[in-house]
Amino acid sequence: MADLSSRVNELHDLLNQYSYEYYVEDNPSVPDSEYDKLLHELIKIEEEHPEYKTVDSPTVRVGGEAQASFNKVNHDTPMLSLGNAFNEDDLRKFDQRIREQIGNVEYMCELKIDGLAVSLKYVDGYFVQGLTRGDGTTGEDITENLKTIHAIPLKMKEPLNVEVRGEAYMPRRSFLRLNEEKEKNDEQLFANPRNAAAGSLRQLDSKLTAKRKLSVFIYSVNDFTDFNARSQSEALDELDKLGFTTNKNRARVNNIDGVLEYIEKWTSQRESLPYDIDGIVIKVNDLDQQDEMGFTQKSPRWAIAYKFPAEEVVTKLLDIELSIGRTGVVTPTAILEPVKVAGTTVSRASLHNEDLIHDRDIRIGDSVVVKKAGDIIPEVVRSIPERRPEDAVTYHMPTHCPSCGHELVRIEGEVALRCINPKCQAQLVEGLIHFVSRQAMNIDGLGTKIIQQLYQSELIKDVADIFYLTEEDLLPLDRMGQKKVDNLLAAIQQAKDNSLENLLFGLGIRHLGVKASQVLAEKYETIDRLLTVTEAELVEIHDIGDKVAQSVVTYLENEDIRALIQKLKDKHVNMIYKGIKTSDIEGHPEFSGKTIVLTGKLHQMTRNEASKWLASQGAKVTSSVTKNTDVVIAGEDAGSKLTKAQSLGIEIWTEQQFVDKQNELNS
């Protein structure tokens, strides 16, 4: 047994060393096959001799049993956000405030990693708990998923009790590999590495997270009691010695001009990095000076985050293609010479509509400027006429639908051209794709390519046909093995139990969005009651305007639609509202019965999370500001809704005020 114990220790040392070389230093000294061989040897020993399995065993990285959900846990110390700077003037004002309070200052500049903030707790040197940032006060316990990240030490080099903060991210190489795999499986692609990292860390099955090859950079420690550090730079050096991975592209600078030089350097070099960054974090380096400056309610006074402007690149417009949406809108898309934008290769970008093409004088063959709106959606910003070739072609939208040949129309008051043929194949396929989407019937496994195959094979012609599919229908399709077929049929069966609002939204009734579907489902409770409503009744409902009322009644009066609903009923698709009625919610008086509008970008939660929480407290969340609005919650870059609220004298809360009120209720 002594020999076995020695071998286990040897395997631990070797696997930890090889893992660090591969995942942290990106410089492996042995081939993957050698690592896998040693790992399987250790797994076998632990299976046969469980007494040798330790909490810091390299086998933990493989992942464990799937969880039912993530527990909410309060942070020992709140995870605050940072104030933002968008230009040199913002930074100089920050510097002036600092120097007015503490005099001469040295700054620490660090890359702002574009990922997911996490908090890691260690007891006696062992990693015991990892949380997401959440709302800053409460996060989700994702410990098992974080254990699969090789850059996170399961055991520190010293037996300290400490909590560190960092940013979990997905390297670009892992992101490209993941999206290639998802594309092969006809699954929805991730928009960017940040979304991929967040989605990977919220997998209930940690084995799936382990396959995603995430990494992490640690950037701070909560309590410096056990640290021999007098500055942020020394604290990062100490973290390195303890076995943590910090970002080495940091720099100490003596003044704000040094900060600006650092920003200029990494603005030009950010694409050379193997991971995404979205800005620069600037901190007062001296820890005593940090203590002297303290905190506001939402952020430290001694730090700020400079956010990069949206990156713009020049490429060539090769062609313009058209797509037809489920409501018949014809949208032009730019086909581009592939170019890197904000870390990903872009070959297509939105042109929105014909008016935009003409207003911006965009022609096929032009050199055009492309950016990602919010670093996510590529769009053509403008053409460069001075570079225009002689053979550049002015684009004219067609007069007839490229899918069905029906004449296109422009409805009064709209900029888009529209195909109004109800039997247009492109619209029908897009309608099927919409029906199975996440906010509608949420049928996992029915991707675009499979739906197109099913439609072209005439196995489905309308949404009800989905519930009539059999194993014999699905098995002959491309890339559909037995396991995939079984999973898809199970997902279709599960979708039958969705609440009425999912079905209403999935039917694709024009002008009827997620919120209005929820309102109608809650109000009428069954599809049969909805089939009898009139426009006059609907317009009396708050949040249901004239357009929605007319569209819903016209749609539900159609005999073909009534036959479709009966076809769904025949397959026992649920047509009843299953949610909790707002009138039954005993919310807090601060929110109950109030009409609230969310505007601008929220940092401590998503808009959807905020809306759900407000609804749980009996509030009514609407999309427009009127004299009946009680409160407007204004996030970053709030625009016309905030201006209108100010002109109407409506109460306005910042995001932090909203979060503070949530925390008061939870305490």
Curated annotation (Swiss-Prot):
Would you say which domain of life the source belongs to? Answer: Bacteria
GO cellular component terms attached to this protein's record: cytosol
Enzyme Commission number(s) from the entry: 6.5.1.2
A Pfam family assignment? HHH_2
Q: Does the keyword Transport apply?
A: no
A molecular function (GO) held by this record is: metal ion binding
Alphabetically list the UniProt keywords: DNA damage, DNA repair, DNA replication, Ligase, Magnesium, Manganese, Metal-binding, NAD, Zinc
Family from the record? Belongs to the NAD-dependent DNA ligase family. LigA subfamily.
Which function does this protein serve?
DNA ligase that catalyzes the formation of phosphodiester linkages between 5'-phosphoryl and 3'-hydroxyl groups in double-stranded DNA using NAD as a coenzyme and as the energy source for the reaction. It is essential for DNA replication and repair of damaged DNA.
Listed name of the protein: DNA ligase
Organism from which the protein derives: Staphylococcus aureus
- Gene encoding this polypeptide? ligA
